[in-house]
């Protein structure tokens, strides 16, 4: 498929107890953490479906593990094309996604995770505009990683470093410098990984947040999980 302007690729995992949001356990059970992730994913996909319409992007949902594609496709908005992630680790899977999108003709590629609920349409617009001059755009998270990546072309080696550490941003920036990329770093956001992140989410509660993640907030309210965060 040819891409006229660009592509948004959402990276997602199957919401399996014991394999997602494990840093929330305790105080939550693995089942509660998995359901919270499922709600986050639902909210992020619904919001992203609106964003890609406004920004004229193609929407791709890259799923891990590959055998979960059918399950996730049944609950994903119809705007998304669901594909399996390919690669032995997250960095290789991200590199694969960028290569595939660019091979299809994408001039700009955005990658986002499925646990950063405050990435809204304006953040994505800012990233796309930054790619007019920058080769790489990153939106940092509070834990040393990032929740949004923008690229104009594949860059070998960019993500070839450990991805589950507090130095992910620094490592990616170092690889970008070696490759001679022009980099733009956006204002930081945060992702939901720990009880402290949930407490921050409650502090930031607002009409904007309610629009971005209604199912997540409803689950936290219904189960009174705020009290254990």
Give a label for each model feature.
Residues 110-112:
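Short aromatic-hydrophobic micro-motifs that form the base-stacking/packing surface
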Residues 37-55:
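A short, N-terminal amphipathic alpha-helix
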Residues 57-65:
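Short beta-strand/loop segment that forms part of the nucleotide-sugar
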Residues 156-175:
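Short, glycine-/small-residue-rich phosphate/pyrophosphate-handling segment
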């Amino acid at each position: 498929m040819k891409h006229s302007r660009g592509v948004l690729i959402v990276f997602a995992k199957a919401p399996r107890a014991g394999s997602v949001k494990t840093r929330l356990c305790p105080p939550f059970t693995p089942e509660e953490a998995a359901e919270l992730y499922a709600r986050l994913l639902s909210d992020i996909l619904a919001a992203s479906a609106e964003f890609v319409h406004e920004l004229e992007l193609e929407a791709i949902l890259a799923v891990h593990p590959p055998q979960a594609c059918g399950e996730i496709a049944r609950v994903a908005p119809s705007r998304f094309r669901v594909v399996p992630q390919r690669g032995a680790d997250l960095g290789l899977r991200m590199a694969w996604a960028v290569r595939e999108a660019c091979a299809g003709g994408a001039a700009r590629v955005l990658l986002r995770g499925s646990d950063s609920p405050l990435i809204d349409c304006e953040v994505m617009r800012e990233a796309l505009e930054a790619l007019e001059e920058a080769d790489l755009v990153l939106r940092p998270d509070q834990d040393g990683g990032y929740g949004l990546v923008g690229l104009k072309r594949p860059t070998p080696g960019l993500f070839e470093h450990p991805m589950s550490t507090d130095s992910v941003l620094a490592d990616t920036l170092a690889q970008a410098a070696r490759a001679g990329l022009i980099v733009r770093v956006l204002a930081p956001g945060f992702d939901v990984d720990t009880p402290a992140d949930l407490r921050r989410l409650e502090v930031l509660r607002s009409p904007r947040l309610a629009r971005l993640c209604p199912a997540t907030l409803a689950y936290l309210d219904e189960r009174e999980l705020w009290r254990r965060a």
